[in-house]
Amino acid sequence: ADAFTTIVIVQEITQGWTAEINRCKTGRDQVRAYAQFENAIHDFADITILSFDSEAAETFHSFPTSLRRIGTMDLKIAAIACSHGALLLSRNLRDFAQVPDLKVENWLD
């Protein structure tokens, strides 16, 4: 099976590294953080990134409003997976199992 990630995951990781870099107090810490961020970017070069396209947006907006407590980003990830008929791998089965038509499994625990 092919492995994919989503543009939403890329966004979350990028925001996380940006926040980490902004918190750095010393030049040494910044060098380390930038190097780790660069490694993360290189990792994305080896994997297909699924877009939040019009089909995913439609799927996202079709979810019941009761699911909003799961979180916008997680619901966007779920919408991308649903729109591609993809299996979502996550440890967060409690929330993702509530999403209609989403195939989700935890392969880690």
Residue spans for each PLM region:
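Conserved acidic donor-binding loop of glycosyltransferase catalytic domains
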Residues: 91
